[in-house]
Amino acid sequence: MPKRRLSATLACYTRRRTLRPCVPAGDEHALEALEALRTAPPVNGDHGHNWGVNEYISRGISGQENYMNAYRNAARAYQCALLWKITGDEGYGDVAIDVLNAYRIYNKGLAGNTNVSLIPGFIGYQFINAAEIMRDYKKWPEEDFELFKQYMIDVWFTTAQDFLERRHDTVEREQNWYHYHSNWGLGNALFCVSLGVLCDLPDIYNYGMYWLKEGPGNESLCVTALHPDAFGQGLCGYGWGLIPWFHKDERGPLGYLNQMQESGRDQGHAMAALGLLSSAFESAYNQGDNAFCNLTNTLIPGQAGAAMVAGAAEYVAAYNSGTDDLPYKQNWWMGGLNATGRGQWRP
C-alpha cells in the first residue's frame, strides 16, 4: 500500500508545508493567498453558512434535488480544514469536524436517477479531502473518525462501484463501455482512490487506479493508448478513452497537443476532466505511486502517461485562455470546440 498520512487529493499537505511557515513570518504573498482562501465562498470571511444535512442526497429528479446542500457543505468542510491546518485556529477545525460528523450521523444514502452517479465523484471526494486533513485533529475522537470512514464506505462507495461496473446497465445493453462521457468514470475513480488513501485500504485504492490506468471505459488512459483512431485517421464514432486524439503540434509537450474526450463540451466539463484526472494522479503521487510515469503508450513515441496528460493540459488550457487555432478531431459527440464558459474562474 502507498504511504499513509499524506493528503488524499490536491497535495494540500505539500501546500501546507510551504504556506504555513510563511504566514507568521509576514510573507506578503502567503498572507494574500491566505486572505483569498479565508474570504472565498462558502466560508466568506467567517465560518460559513450551514446548509443542513439531507437524509438522502438526491440528484436528477425534478423537485427532489438537494445535492447543492452537500456540495456547499463539502466545500465548507474542506476550506475550514485547510484554514485550521494553516492557521491553527480551532474555530475552523471545529466547523470542519461538525460538518463531517453531521453527515456521518444523519445522511443515510444517495438517491436520484442516473445522475446519482455524479454525487461521489463531484462531492464525496471533497468530504474525504476534509477528513484526511482533520484526521490528526485532537478534538476529533478516534472513534468518530473510524465511524466516518465506515460511513463513506457504506453510503458512498457502493454508488461509485455500481457505476464503474454497470454504468446503469448500458454495458450489458449496448455491449460497450462508452455510453457516458469520461467525467462520470473519472469522478467515481477519483472517489475510490481518495477513499482508499483515507481508510488505508489497498483494495479500494487499487480499484480506483485500475479504472484510470487499465479499465475499459472513457475515463481510462489505457483505452486511449489502444484506440485505433488515435492518430486522427478517419471519424471515430464516440471518441473512446480519456485522451482519444494526439495532434502533432510544436506548441505541445514533445510536439503534441492532445484532445480529450470531453473537449468540445462547454468549458466547465472540459476543464473538469483535466481537474479530476490531475487530482487522482496527484493523490497517487503523494503516496509514492508515480502513476503518470508508470503508464506507457506504444502508439506514439514519447507519449507515455506524463506526456499524454501534459499534452492534454496544454490543449485544454490553451483554448480556455483564448487560443483559437487549435486542431480538433470531429467525432460523434461533438463537432468542434465549445466556447461556453470560456475564461471563467472555476472552483
What residue ranges belong to the model's regions?
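Extracellular glycan-targeting catalytic surfaces
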Residues: 1-174, 186, 190, 210-213, ...
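Long, repeat-rich segments with strong aromatic
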Residues: 196-328
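Active-site-proximal alpha-helical scaffolds that flank and shape metal-associated catalytic sites
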Residues: 150, 179-192, 203-206
